[in-house]
Amino acid sequence: MLLRFTKMHGLGNDFMVLDLVSQHAHILPKHAKQWGDRHTGIGFDQLLLVEAPNNPDVDFRYRIFNSDGSEVEQCGNGARCFARFVLDKRLTAKKQIRVETKSGIIELDIRSDGQISVDMGPPRFVPEEIPFEAAEQATRYNVEVDGQNIELAAVSMGNPHAVLRVDDINNAPVHELGPKIEHHPRFPARVNVGFLHVVDRQRAQLRVWERGAGETQACGTGACAAAVAAISQGWMDSPLLIDLPGGRLSIEWAGPGHSVMMTGPAVRVYEGQVRL
């Protein structure tokens, strides 16, 4: 059968989006891996599935597969594209949408200026909830990599993140340390790794090595995790701007127990069909 899909991106973090509300198909990890190949497939960072909800209190179910076929809990840039997609496809007329994900419910707000705000929910710091192996909860941890102690923050935004502060974003060891920390045994579910350079109290630069995808142009949950880490450690104040290789996100967080709000664009690139 032929499936209609839409190619989208949020700050260069690119997605294949499938409507499984009006189309009926069983998508497997092997399909994500096959379609995700940039040489022999469609090519994307993540595959986003729009499904009917299991929960009557939400509008849609949102599933995410990395291009390596692994299913993940959350994707912030994808959430903005999800909101733009369901509105453009007339799957809803609502400008405020509640969506269930593998890690819980998120709320999406399509603003009049075309930007999309996502209530990502409160961050989690308890090591078992990230998950991260540590004797006790702390603001910063030392993790040994190749005999060196690497200082990082660990936080969950529905998916696990490690945040490292760097002095030079252009020369940050993203491709050297990223995969080693991603697969570090203290992160049993693997981890997304953010390299953060604080410019001033309202602006920072960020590069992210994404679990299962490598370095991407942008990572919404990574930007949220980096902002939370920077605010928690007194480096920055809310609201703040995070500049990623693909563009800028605005992040707000009022502190522990409060939700993280992320605002940024979502762009449709093209429509296509793929054989299942």
Swiss-Prot record:
It is found in: Cytoplasm. The record marks 161, 210 as: Could be important to modulate the pK values of the two catalytic cysteine residues. It comes from the Bacteria. Substrate binds at residues 13, 46, 66, 76-77, 159, 192, 210-211, 220-221. GO terms for molecular function: diaminopimelate epimerase activity. The active site is at 75 (proton donor), 219 (proton acceptor). It catalyses: (2S,6S)-2,6-diaminopimelate = meso-2,6-diaminopimelate. NCBIfam families: DapF (TIGR00652). Catalyzes the stereoinversion of LL-2,6-diaminopimelate (L,L-DAP) to meso-diaminopimelate (meso-DAP), a precursor of L-lysine and an essential component of the bacterial peptidoglycan. This is Diaminopimelate epimerase. It comes from Pseudomonas savastanoi pv. phaseolicola (strain 1448A / Race 6) (Pseudomonas syringae pv. phaseolicola (strain 1448A / Race 6)).
